[in-house]
């Protein structure tokens, strides 16, 4: 799985960085968890404040386009981000925690 950053914009009004990216892969579309972990590694960001908002498959290609946000802190993320996006990203973190406990 390869990630290419299309744009990286700082948005000081909403206390975040906004990243648009493309993901190239060989088999099935990667999960949000996999993309999030790869973005954490590529961007050297904290996984607690990184949110993958969208990940859309490009028809007929082994590529997907995505949009992620890196907040300055968790408080800003909790007040600005919608519940559905937080749940989508939080479920992945909870699954990670359960695996780590076992």
Swiss-Prot record:
Its GO biological process annotations read:
translation
Is NAD among this UniProt entry's keywords?
A: no
What's an example of a GO molecular-function annotation for this chain?
A: structural constituent of ribosome
Q: Which Pfam families match?
A: Ribosomal_S24e (PF01282)
Q: What is this protein called?
A: Small ribosomal subunit protein eS24
What keywords tag this UniProt record?
Ribonucleoprotein, Ribosomal protein
Q: Which PROSITE patterns match?
A: RIBOSOMAL_S24E
Cell membrane among keywords:
no
Q: HAMAP family attached here?
A: Ribosomal_eS24
- What cellular component GO annotations does this protein have? ribonucleoprotein complex; ribosome
List the source organism. Answer: Methanococcus maripaludis (strain C7 / ATCC BAA-1331)
Q: Which domain of life is it from?
A: Archaea
What family is reported?
Belongs to the eukaryotic ribosomal protein eS24 family.
Q: Give the InterPro entries listed for this entry.
A: Nucleotide-bd_a/b_plait_sf, Ribosomal_eS24, Ribosomal_eS24_CS, Ribosomal_uL23/eL15/eS24_sf
Q: What is the lineage of its organism?
A: Archaea, Methanobacteriati, Methanobacteriota, Methanomada group, Methanococci
């Amino acid at each position: 799985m390869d990630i290419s950053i299309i744009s990286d914009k700082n948005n000081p009004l909403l206390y975040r960085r906004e990243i648009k990216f493309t993901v190239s892969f060989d088999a099935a579309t990667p999960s949000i968890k996999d993309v999030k972990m790869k973005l954490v590694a590529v961007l050297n960001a904290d996984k607690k404040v990184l949110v993958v908002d969208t990940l859309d498959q490009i028809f007929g290609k082994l590529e997907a386009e995505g949009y992620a946000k890196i907040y300055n802190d968790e408080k800003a993320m909790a007040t600005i981000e919608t519940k559905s996006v937080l749940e989508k990203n939080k479920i992945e973190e909870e699954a990670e925690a359960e695996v780590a406990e076992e």
